[in-house]
């Protein structure tokens, strides 16, 4: 990035890198905003154990839900419905904030894809989940570029600048 800060003309490669960093950074932030929204909606709706139990009961009666998820729902989610109900909204909000800030972006994209897989397995589909899945893949594909505009990079740049100055 320091090469881009000099007075020399940008090369085609510099322009491509800059464009990719803007694109994949926007993908990361967009995914973060969607997760932030998901968590916010659940917080406002007072999401809790009753919602988790609704998913568990729905999974046992729904032929579209895979057998492995029915097993997980009955033996893991049902006994921990209180904890899962409490933790789901803050998990989604935290995931959104971490992606927006660009902290642990690769891990966050994997967690995002994993949560979406769990939601899909339970047949809890909403319109933005396919978009969120594509954005999760986008963060993973562009991981070398998506963090150029992150809080961690800005902190590193600032400390490097202070050391030089």
Where do the language-model regions lie?
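Extended, low-polarity transmembrane helix blocks
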Residues: 1-67, 71-94, 101-165
């Amino acid at each position: 990035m320091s090469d881009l800060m000099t007075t020399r003309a940008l090369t085609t490669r510099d322009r491509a890198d800059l464009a990719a960093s803007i694109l994949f950074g926007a993908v990361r932030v967009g995914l973060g905003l969607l997760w932030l929204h998901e968590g916010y909606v659940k917080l406002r709706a007072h999401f809790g154990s009753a919602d988790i139990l609704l998913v568990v009961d729905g999974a046992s009666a729904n032929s579209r839900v895979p057998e492995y998820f029915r097993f997980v729902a009955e033996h893991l989610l049902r006994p921990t419905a209180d904890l899962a109900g409490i933790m789901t909204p803050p998990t989604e909000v935290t995931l959104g904030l971490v992606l927006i800030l660009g902290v642990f972006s690769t891990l966050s994209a994997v967690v995002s894809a994993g949560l979406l897989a769990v939601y899909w397995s339970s047949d809890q589909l909403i319109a933005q989940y396919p978009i969120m899945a594509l954005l999760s893949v986008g963060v993973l594909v562009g991981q070398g570029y998506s963090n150029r505009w992150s809080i961690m990079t800005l902190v590193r740049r600032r400390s490097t600048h202070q050391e030089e100055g």
